[in-house]
Amino acid sequence: MIYIDNIVAQEVMDSRGNPTVKATVTLSDGNSASAIVPSGASTGKREALELRDGDSRYLGKGVLQACENVNTKLSEELIGLSPFDQSEIDAIIQELDGTENFANIGANAALGVSMAVARSAAKSLNIPLYRYLGGANALTLPVPMLNIINGGSHADNTVDFQEYMIMPLGFENFSESLRASAEVYHHLKKILKDSKHITSIGDEGGFAPNLKTNEEPIQIIIQAIEKAGYRPGEEIALALDVASSEFVNEQGLYHLEGEGRTLSSEELVGYYESLIAKYPIVSIEDGLSEDDWKGWKYLTERLGGKVQLVGDDLFVTNAKILQEGISQGIANAILIKPNQIGTVSQTMQTVRLAQRNHYRCVMSHRSGESEDSFIADFAVALNTGEIKTGSTARSERIAKYNRLLAIESELCRSEYLGRSLF
């Protein structure tokens, strides 16, 4: 019987220069695999706990304690077990922690080990990770949601909305959709440069210009799509991640600092309606605060039949919270971030719940990333159909796209949903 022979973690760096956990699992057959855990900038209140040291190192952001938890507590419990029973491994990790949000060992410790176990098992069987996790039905290449203009907490500018994205829908396969997206990105850079805007980039590779309103990025992106020779709304559509929990005040009002105005939930929904009427927007993420469930109900009633309404901070990849949303008719899609919940198995449980209830799933990176491409395989394994992993810049974002290109070339038969998504 093949068993887990060793587990070790070390502190490495993420794309923002902050420490994170790298876990390595070695099996008795000599196979070994590692995983690096991502970290978010705008985080939901109910996310699993990311354990930080809080001392003088790295401005308190060190993860030596999380690594120590891997090297002692998790290692002692998991060595000798089969790597091929992912659900059992993950259940043991949860039981060892003893809390619902990994407050003891840290979700960064838990997820690092969980991902590394899955990788080592796939490597031992000599099959790709997407095939190991998804089986024979893992055939769908995701439509990318490329963040090409950054605002909010992802950039140092005057734009309130966090992400302005393009979705290449009118293409037959993933590689063609990525090519078109890269062309739009380059045209966008030229437009910004010609207009004397700065072309510095944010955490996820998108540009971060100082623009006057939250509508102006949409207008500039449409120009870039047209300059690249594509039809807005037909071949390339738009998507927004508003991240509104970042600018809601204690009174439950939404303060758009860049525009100098404050809106109620209903007024903000009305603003979205006006944008959807004017521009080819097909998806809005975190349109209202994670605590504004009444507002979300109103948002879903008004716009749920027109666009994809994605819950990120709202659901935090948590099956229990998602079930509440399903029961109340809130949103129609969920963002999937494994580090919000803590293990591979819990992530899969949430995706399956969403899919059973006809909620779309969007696999997602975090703003603090690394060269680890686990989510690319995970998106294909779970047939999520959509993925968010930044722009066509910054190597930690490109790593995921390059992995998806490799997967597409490996598959004799694959599917790219494109326009059929909407």
From Swiss-Prot:
InterPro entries found in the cross-reference section: Enolase, Enolase-like_C_sf, Enolase-like_N, Enolase_C, Enolase_CS, Enolase_N
Reactions that this protein is recorded to catalyse: (2R)-2-phosphoglycerate = phosphoenolpyruvate + H2O
CDD domains: enolase
One GO MF term: magnesium ion binding
Cofactor note: Binds a second Mg(2+) ion via substrate during catalysis.
Enzyme Commission number(s) from the entry: 4.2.1.11
Binding locations of (2R)-2-phosphoglycerate: Q162, K337, R366, S367, K388
SMART domains, per database record: Enolase_C, Enolase_N
GO cellular component: cell surface; extracellular region; phosphopyruvate hydratase complex
Coiled coil: none
Keyword Transmembrane helix appears in the UniProt entry: no
Pfam families hit by this protein: Enolase_C, Enolase_N
Positions annotated as active site in the UniProt record: E204 (proton donor), K337 (proton acceptor)
Residues engaged in binding Mg(2+): D241, E285, D312
Top-level EC class as recorded in UniProt: lyase
Stated family: Belongs to the enolase family.
Protein known as: Enolase
Biological source species: Wolinella succinogenes (strain ATCC 29543 / DSM 1740 / CCUG 13145 / JCM 31913 / LMG 7466 / NCTC 11488 / FDC 602W)
Gene name per UniProt: eno
